[in-house]
Amino acid sequence: EDIGNAKVGFVLESGFNSDDGASGQGGRLFGREAQVNVSGAYGTLYAGRIASIVSDSGSIGYLGDVSAFPNAFGFVGSQAGSTGSAYGRYDTTLAYQPPVFSGLQAAVLYSFKADSKTDTTSRENSSFADRYAAAGLRYKAGKAAVVLAADYTMYSNATNPDLDDG
């Protein structure tokens, strides 16, 4: 939807197991991706449940450009196999991508609470909750692509909540 000099969009993506029809992603209705985004001259801001930059799927997954084992090959190439984190998709997330400049694109992502379905007791963005951050650069020129990405999981500290290890 155009709103002046910006556009607002959304993605609602659900998944199911093809062998038995059961809902995927822990029973979430839109467990694959559920985000709203605003884009304009300065890039795109995303909010919601999003796959990581260090992933080969989702709206901002950079590894799909360079993965020898894309997501279609199962766990080996899935987002859970390409990141050091316990999660492939992240709840309560903000992400930003500035515009592409001469084939170079950047992205940053921060999740205030990585998994709000299994972690129902902790506060967002506190030492009680698993938090996650990622950043990436992607360069594309014709059929060539180079990706540099990093991620960091700040695991919760339920035994000593006053100590914030992340």
Please name every model-derived segment.
Residues 3, 66, 72, 116, ...:
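Short linear motifs in intrinsically disordered/low-complexity regions
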Residues 22, 81, 118-123, 158-161:
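Extracellular loop and loop/strand-boundary signature of outer-membrane beta-barrel proteins
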Residues 128-166:
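Detector for outer-membrane/organellar transmembrane beta-barrel domains
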Residues 56, 116, 155-159:
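Short acidic/glycine-rich loop or secondary-structure boundary segments that cap or lie
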Residues 1-113, 129, 138-145:
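Outer membrane beta-barrel
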